[in-house]
Amino acid sequence: MLEDYYQLDNSYYQRGVEDNLYAAKWGMVIEFLNLNDPNLKPVEGVNFALIGFKSDKGVYINHGRVGAVEGPQSIRTQLAKLPWHLGRNVHVFDVGDIDGPNRSLEQLQSSLAKAVKRLRELNLRPIVLGGGHETAYGNYLGLKSSLKPEQELAVINMDAHFDLRPYDQTGPNSGTGFRQMFDETLAQKQVFNYLILGIQEHNNNLFLFDFVAKSKAIQFLTGLDIYQMGHKEVCKVVDAFLADKEQVYLTIDIDCFAAGAAPGVSAIQSLGVDPNLAVLVFQHIAASGKLIGFDVVEVSPPHDIDNHTANLAASFIFYLTQVWAQIHD
């Protein structure tokens, strides 16, 4: 039985007429699934699973603006309003949330990892709704554990921050997840292949740039690089990164986008990546056939304006799944 796992009430989404998909919205089509049902068997075809990670404990520890714990609900609300374009043969299941106000960050990450692994075992493609960016470490652990021990998992992070901070004194938080991945991969005598898109120099100290420079397999583009290059050149960088990789995990930190597009985040930005460009890059990653899971994190509803940020997150899911649904395992 999964710990810290809660199903949604069946009345959460508006139900619709199934045979009228031309007029349907996501909220009318999404189905429910109980991951603790012992009778579940792997599903056939292309199927997605939404799972919320209701925690911003890592943001609190990292001295950020708390509120991302409410992110999953806000993203779901916006996603439910979007038109359904995935046809009859693609299914989206909402399996509920990982939640535990009185549980430690590490316990919740472990619970998320087990849930994500369970989704993979059921042939469901995981889409995790954060939550702070501590979501990423739990998601990564789950995806990695679903692979064979010798298989490596590349990571692409759309983010204004490296999130490679040391954690020996502070403990894990929303800014340490990728350092934890790095250390764990090193301990397994593997290489941590990590590409960050959208780095803002004014948000990262020289210690982090030095750490990246000394590493073997960490690459990045700054937000200004991306602005100058355009999406086609950015996609070439992605292609080069993925050329010798078999699996990739994508994590989207909404604070990569400027406040005009994403005001409701844990760490607000004055500069940021163009969301339209980001959509094209996300779709390109999905089209590679190597994507095995993604998440959208750091949506903080208490700081949002007219649900702009939650709607942006939902839009990314909408456009990314359009391409990912065309990739058959």
From Swiss-Prot:
Cofactor note: Binds 2 manganese ions per subunit.
Cofactor: Mn(2+)
UniProt-annotated binding residues for Mn(2+) 2: D159, H161, D253, D255
SUPFAM superfamilies xref list: Arginase/deacetylase
EC assignment: 3.5.3.8
Pathway: Amino-acid degradation; L-histidine degradation into L-glutamate; L-glutamate from N-formimidoyl-L-glutamate (hydrolase route): step 1/1
GO terms for MF: agmatinase activity; formimidoylglutamase activity; manganese ion binding
Highest taxon, organism lineage: Bacteria
Catalytic reaction(s) noted: N-formimidoyl-L-glutamate + H2O = formamide + L-glutamate
Residues the record lists as binding Mn(2+) 1: H133, D159, D163, D253
Keywords for this protein: Histidine metabolism, Hydrolase, Manganese, Metal-binding
NCBIfam families: hutG, PRK13775.1
Purpose of the protein: Catalyzes the conversion of N-formimidoyl-L-glutamate to L-glutamate and formamide.
Family: Belongs to the arginase family.
Protein's UniProt name: Formimidoylglutamase
Organism (species): Streptococcus gordonii (strain Challis / ATCC 35105 / BCRC 15272 / CH1 / DL1 / V288)
Lineage: Bacteria, Bacillati, Bacillota, Bacilli, Lactobacillales
